[in-house]
Amino acid sequence: MNSIGIRGGVSGSSPIGELETQYFQEYDVMANWSMPWEWYSASGWGVGTRLMGSVGAVRASGDTAFVTTLVPGFVFGRKDGWLSLEVGGGGALLSQHRFAHQDMGGTFQFVWDTALRAKVYRGIGLGYWFHHLSDASLYGHNAHGFDLHMLEVSYRF
């Protein structure tokens, strides 16, 4: 494991053009593991792979659902984690998929994450995550996902 942290965020304008019918919030605890595939230059810059997992809660219109994610991805930046851009895609499980004004279709959802993360003091880091959950039409065209803008506080080992 190379980092642990907490994240929290809210839905907002989406750069991918989907409209949520709810205002969503998500809070979770996350962990990142380095995977063995990487290439870094002598200067320390390069690309690596990681596996990110999280457990937390999603809220909308007074409804709260348990959410867990598992997202493999790529890390672009310095090997020491001083600054990185992370991109990944994976899966999520929700304990409920119907909220007051929005049906997400089913328990399983696809996840797309993009994160900008930086160390700010010793092992302590801050990050911004764009977090997209949707069924990718797995449950039909009437289901809607959501996009979150999340902030992270983490500790890197």
Listing of model-derived features with the role each one plays in the protein:
Residues Y40-G77:
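Mid-chain, structured segments of secreted extracytoplasmic proteins
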Residues I4-G12, T49-A57, V87-G91, L126-H132:
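Transmembrane beta-barrel strands of outer-membrane/channel proteins
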Residues N2, T21-Y27, T64-L70, G106-F110, ...:
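Residues that define the transmembrane beta-barrel architecture of outer-membrane proteins
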Residues M1-W37, L148-F157:
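Short glycine/proline- and aromatic-enriched beta-strand/turn motifs that initiate or cap beta-hairpins
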Residues P15, T114-F157:
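Predominantly the C-terminal beta-signal and adjacent terminal strand-loop region
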Residues I6, Y27-M35, V55, L70-R78, ...:
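Residues on the lipid-exposed face of transmembrane beta-strands in outer-membrane beta-barrel proteins
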Residues M1-N2, M35-V47, G62, K79-S84, ...:
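Short loop/turn motifs that connect adjacent beta-strands in outer-membrane beta-barrel proteins
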Residues P15-E18, V58-A60, R98-Q102, A136-G140:
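Extracellular loop and loop/strand-boundary signature of outer-membrane beta-barrel proteins
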